[in-house]
Every structure is written in C-alpha cells, then in structure tokens.
Design a protein with these regions (language model features):
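Catalytic core segments in nucleotide and nucleic-acid processing enzymes
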Residues: 212-280
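Terminal, charged accessory segments of proteins
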Residues: 1-196
C-alpha cells in the first residue's frame, strides 16, 4: 500500500524536549558544544543543533532539531558530505532534508569537515570548520527574512563553493591521516548533478529517496515484533516543494482513520530510547 498525503499548513505542540544548556557565543566551538544548546550574547539568543551526518536515518538528528523547536530562532548545522573512508560510507545531503528544516522554520548552515582521526581503514572524530560555522551564525544573527529564504539562498549561491571546500579539506585529511577516502570524482558528480538550480537538486535527491523507500519497503527487521504484515509506503508532499518518501512498519485501518505503527527494538534496554521516537 502507498499512503499519500499533503501538508497544507503546520501546527504542533512541543513535548518531551530536553533543557538546553546555555553557551555564550564568545565561547562558541561547534565541535565542543552539545548536540543541541542555547547560544546567547548580550542582545540575542537562539537555539542551535548539529548533525553528525547528512543522512537522516543515522544518529537520530531529528531529535536534536526537535529539542530546539520551542525557541523562536533555530539553527541547525549539517555537513553536506561525510566521507568515512574508502572502506566506509559516504553520505550526501538531500533536498528534502533542507525542505523539512524550512517547513519547521529552521535555518540551515551547510558545513564541512576539516580535521579527522585515523581508525584502521576509516576516519573518525571529524571536526567542522569552526570559523566558517561561526561566521554563518553571525550572518544569521543579522538576518531578518525567513529560514526558507535563507536556506534557498544558501543552496543557490553557496553550495558549489562549499563542495569545493569539501574537496580540498578531504584531500588534506587523506594526506594527514593516510586513510584512502572515496574518489573525489563523486564530489564533482554531485556538484554537476545538483547544478546551480534548486530544481535540479530537488530532482536528483528525489530519485535517490524514492529508490531508498523501495528498498526499505521490502526489508523486514526480525527483531521487531509486528502483529501484521502490513508494511506500507508513505509519500508526503508539502507546500514548499518538499516530498518525503517514507515507510511505516504497520498500518491499522478503522473506518475513516489510518493508524501508522512503527516498530523499534533495543539490544540491551527494555524499551528503545525516547530519542528514537521524538520525531516519528
């Protein structure tokens, strides 16, 4: 089954958020700060979160964003590419991630890594370019248009420049760590496919997301106890041009109501962590 929906407006009540630690902007270091915090100076304060991968299904980044939603001005820092080494993964940011952040009025800083440590045939503990992230925060501090406008402008005017920085930084990391990374041609291909037009980025990302949805649809987790075999596709479109290709483990149909049931499991705990469920 493919359940199709459209978001025409958004309202929500934020529950179960964590208290945000206050960090003075003069002491800011994106690599040392908590995954979500409240950044303050003498005049302004805003919430900031950071992702450790551009891939939405790793490390539960949506929980980090969720914890900032009750603050009026929200920023999230996302690496546009993360290369873990030739024997590991390389993930790229997707259009619909940006679209969802825009829908939630979250400013996105598209960031890149400049340092890392060697761990066998991979690299770990990758560090953002703090000066770059800080400069973007200062820009947003003075920015008075919407997060949507900021995010689209950054995609249109700055994304190619950041990809060039990614290439340079990963070449340096490969040299200093001695770990062979993925071929840089993949970065050039990404740059070419997204072009300088948001619509090209959207189409490229959407094709990958739809394929991922199809793969997930036929995948079953043996550790998740399900009462039915009613796994379904869920395709949602929003009024900002976002389209989300999702799956749900079970559905329950009762008259005019469709219940979406998501199964989760934990290796050691009695129940999965609450962070897994905040953004479901």
């Amino acid at each position: 089954m493919n359940i199709v929906g459209k978001i025409t407006g958004i309202t929500y009540k934020v529950l179960l958020t964590e208290d945000l630690k206050k960090v003075e902007i003069k002491n800011f270091d994106i690599n040392q700060m908590p995954s979500s915090c409240l950044l303050t100076d003498n005049k302004n304060s805003f919430a900031i979160s950071k992702w450790v991968s551009p891939k939405r299904t790793r490390s539960y980044p949506f929980e980090r964003v969720f914890n900032t939603l009750n603050i009026s001005k929200k920023i999230t820092v996302i690496p546009i590419v993360k290369d873990e080494g030739g024997k590991g993964d390389r993930d790229f940011i997707q259009w619909d991630t940006v679209s969802l952040m825009s829908l939630l009025d979250v400013f996105v800083i598209f960031a890149y890594y400049t340092e890392a440590e060697k761990a066998d045939l991979k690299i770990i503990n990758q560090q953002f370019d703090n000066k770059y992230v800080y400069s973007k925060i200062k820009e947003i501090e003075q920015y008075h248009s919407s997060a949507l406008h900021w995010n689209l402008n950054e995609l249109n005017t700055n994304l190619h420049n950041i990809i060039d920085k990614v290439k340079t930084s990963y070449a340096d990391i490969e040299k200093t760590t001695g770990v062979k990374l993925h071929n840089a041609n993949g970065l050039d291909n990404f740059k070419d496919k997204i072009g300088k037009d948001v619509s090209l980025f959207m189409a490229f990302s959407r094709g990958k997301a739809e394929k991922a949805q199809s793969r997930e649809f036929v995948t079953f987790q043996p550790k998740e106890s399900l009462s039915t075999l009613s796994k379904a596709k869920v395709t949602i479109t929003n009024y900002l041009g976002g389209q989300y290709f999702l799956t749900v483990d079970e559905i329950l149909l009762t008259k005019d109501k469709v219940s979406l049931i998501e199964g989760k499991h934990s290796k050691n705990a009695i129940l999965p962590r609450i962070s897994i469920n905040k953004f479901l």
